Amino acid sequence: MDFGASAKNLSTPVKGAKIVPNMTVDELVKEYAGCAFGAGRLAEAVDIYYEMLASGKTTKFFGLAGAMTPAGMRNIIADLIRDGYIDVLVTTGANMVHDTVEALGLHHYKGSDCANDIQLRHECIDRIYDVYLPDQHFTDLEEFLQGVYSGLPQENLSIRQVLTEIGKNLDDDSSILKTAAEMGVPVYCPALQDSVIGLQAWLYKEGNPLHVDAFADMHEFMDICYGAESAGTMLLGGGVPKNYILQSMLVTPRSFDYAIQLTMDRPETGGLSGATLDEAQSWGKVGEDAKSVTVYADSTITLPLIVSAVRTRLSKR
């Protein structure tokens, strides 16, 4: 038996969490740190995210996939942007669709995943797992978007510029797009066509001049990557936002120094959404000495816990 190796592998005992009344979220997370499995990973994510946000030299990327805005996560993200904790946001079109719906005063409603979907269809109600919204919301959204598109400059625009203009036309401090436009934080959506915002842009373009270059954002995005002294990313889910962020480092001399992934996807099928951050190291996307962790849990549970704990630590600096 190699007693030296055994001593190394048996150096950190699992410490049972102790829960007491009136604990803060950060105190709870510190108890998680002594635990294994998902609890230990979440505590590690808090440590990494704190270091990433506290660093004065790290460019902070945020990947937003899934249905985070209809689930109620938009305030958290808007506040992170407002307080300077997101430098670059990459998102799916759907998240910005539902952000805009809310910004127009149109609500999402708590429903049930056990609904009769045929009945919901007859009632003109759309379902996103256990969230409902009426079809009429999309009619109102479409009217708003058509008005925005009609006021766009008659020149070649990037998708980022289109999203900025949408944000400028919103009046809701909880809006991700409005906050990003006010703070000068770029919002990139490489697959905007895969959303109502993109669909309405195409419909408008069928009868009106609208010039959007789907590749125009690449140069600007790569300039940000090249200019980053250090880079870190928080990835909610996978898909296009995750890959768009991570692949950017393939054309720069560096890799991500910090990376956190909150996901429910599995790696066994070989898809990007479930790919581990360790796998990303083989591509050079995440650095050899990077601080990284994947937390396998619902992002609507883990993101609020992580952000709350990190904000507590940041307030004590």
UniProtKB/Swiss-Prot annotation:
Gene3D superfamilies: Deoxyhypusine synthase (3.40.910.10). The keyword NAD applies. One of its GO terms (molecular function) is deoxyhypusine synthase activity. It comes from the Archaea. Its cofactor is NAD(+). Its EC number is 2.5.1.46. It catalyses: [eIF5A protein]-L-lysine + spermidine = [eIF5A protein]-deoxyhypusine + propane-1,3-diamine. It holds the Pfam family DS. Catalyzes the NAD-dependent oxidative cleavage of spermidine and the subsequent transfer of the butylamine moiety of spermidine to the epsilon-amino group of a specific lysine residue of the eIF-5A precursor protein to form the intermediate deoxyhypusine residue. PANTHER family: DEOXYHYPUSINE SYNTHASE, DEOXYHYPUSINE SYNTHASE-LIKE PROTEIN. Belongs to the deoxyhypusine synthase family. This is Probable deoxyhypusine synthase 1. The gene is dys1.
